[in-house]
Amino acid sequence: MAVTTTEFDTIAAISTPPGEGGISIIRLSGEEVFQVAAKLFKGADLTQVGSHTIHYGHILDPETGDEVDEVMVTVMRAPKTYTKEDIIEINCHGGIVATNRILQLCLSYGARLAEPGEYTKRAFLNGRIDLTQAESVMDLIRAKTDKSMKVALDQLDGDLSKLIRNLRQDILDALAQVEVNIDYPEYDDVETMTTKMLLEKAHEVKQQIKTLLATAKQGKVLREGLATAIVGRPNVGKSSLLNHLLHEDKAIVTDVAGTTRDVIEEYVNVKGVPLKLIDTAGIRDTTDKVEKIGVERSRKAINTADLVMLVLNASEPLTAEDEALLTATKDTQRILILNKTDLPLQLDLAAVRQVAGDSPIIETSILQSTGMDQLEETIAHLFFDEGIESSQNTVMVTNARHIGLLHQASAALDDVQNGIAAGMPVDLVQIDMTRAWDLLGEITGDSYQDELLDQLFSQFCLGK
């Protein structure tokens, strides 16, 4: 149920990142935005102007009459706004002093500092968007590739919401038939028809949930990035690989073994797949205390990574350290990179292929940029069988909360099928069907708890 705007006070926050810039935006939302602005803005009478218009003027300190900044003020009237409330946005010169001064004046003359995510929370509570769309706002802000941005936009447009609501409607139609059976128990054929319909509907909805969950692995990668550990013994080209993928020098590249003492993390877009690259310290036996800590962190990175890129030096024979790493990573999703192929080959390729298993083997010379296109294509196809474009028009589930609720809803439908198979009365089976309906409703926010909203929106930034 939507909450009316009269239940909300007027809030204000800075919507642009802190620091110096071209402009800053202070956003106000609520019933009294015009009263607050009228006390500060010298220019047009904002109470008389039309919606979605921009007006030039100045912000003055009402107490001293001093001019604070030259501004442009945008007026947006309810309900056609982000929050479905009256909104005023003050565009001032970028910078910490002027921006904070204007915000403080807004707070001094009737507004309250917004909580993190409160604008989006109001958009949800006022019925402009559902919970899935609200969560997609943060996904859009955090998107690291064009594809992850597209998925977030699709969810913001309601693609996932529409699919979930269709599933809920299918369940609701089935529940209505159950009510007929309960109201007319004297007709035996009604119960038979109802249980048959419930079985078919439970199977049908479960299959659609299964199809949606099949996108979860790819969706999670797009939303959170692929945790990718670059591992290998010292001085095989790990940092060079990191720098090449980043197209900049983030890691130190030298001929000295053990130069990378810590774990370096960076995000990079590889063929539309967001990678969270983890350049680890070279793994070897060492007496250096600092390097030892880095080596231990490298081992942990291997265990938690979604993808391991194991770099071997093709210009040297396989060492005991190489063999140990091949063993340590054999149960991971990995790519073997045979680097320095521009030098005379010393590595026993047959021996490497024998222990590689299903792991792709890519021959590279990072120094000469050979083999890198093949590496990037391999990464993309490991997680998107036909490439990132193959999922272009697919509704995807990317959020761990949604994935968990879909699994729970599927389990509830299992209980429906098992209950009917066991000969349970229809009114008892109805309980599990209703549970599946409620669980799907938690995805879109058609049913929710206040604690959930507080947790979700606290992850947003101020001003959004």
Swiss-Prot record:
GO biological process, one term: tRNA methylation
Gene3D superfamilies (UniProt xref): P-loop containing nucleotide triphosphate hydrolases, Probable tRNA modification gtpase trme, domain 1, tRNA modification GTPase MnmE domain 2
Residues given in the record as K(+) binding sites: N235, T254, V256, T259
Subcellular localization: Cytoplasm
Residues that, per the record, bind (6S)-5-formyl-5,6,7,8-tetrahydrofolate: R27, E89, R128, K464
Predominant cellular place of this UniProt entry's protein: cytoplasm
Entry GO CC: cytosol
Binding of GTP, residues: 235-240, 254-260, 279-282
Note describing how the cofactor binds: Binds 1 potassium ion per subunit.
Co-factor requirement: K(+)
Residue numbers binding Mg(2+): S239, T260
Record key words, sorted: Cytoplasm, GTP-binding, Hydrolase, Magnesium, Metal-binding, Nucleotide-binding, Potassium, tRNA processing
Pfam families: MMR_HSR1, MnmE_helical, TrmE_N
Superkingdom per UniProt: Bacteria
Domain annotation TrmE-type G: ranges: 225-384
Subunit field text: Homodimer. Heterotetramer of two MnmE and two MnmG subunits.
General function of this protein: Exhibits a very high intrinsic GTPase hydrolysis rate. Involved in the addition of a carboxymethylaminomethyl (cmnm) group at the wobble position (U34) of certain tRNAs, forming tRNA-cmnm(5)s(2)U34.
Family that this chain belongs to: Belongs to the TRAFAC class TrmE-Era-EngA-EngB-Septin-like GTPase superfamily. TrmE GTPase family.
PANTHER family found in the cross-reference section: TRNA MODIFICATION GTPASE GTPBP3 (PTHR42714), TRNA MODIFICATION GTPASE GTPBP3, MITOCHONDRIAL (PTHR42714:SF2)
Name recorded for this polypeptide: tRNA modification GTPase MnmE
Natural source organism: Levilactobacillus brevis (strain ATCC 367 / BCRC 12310 / CIP 105137 / JCM 1170 / LMG 11437 / NCIMB 947 / NCTC 947) (Lactobacillus brevis)
Organism lineage: Bacteria, Bacillati, Bacillota, Bacilli, Lactobacillales
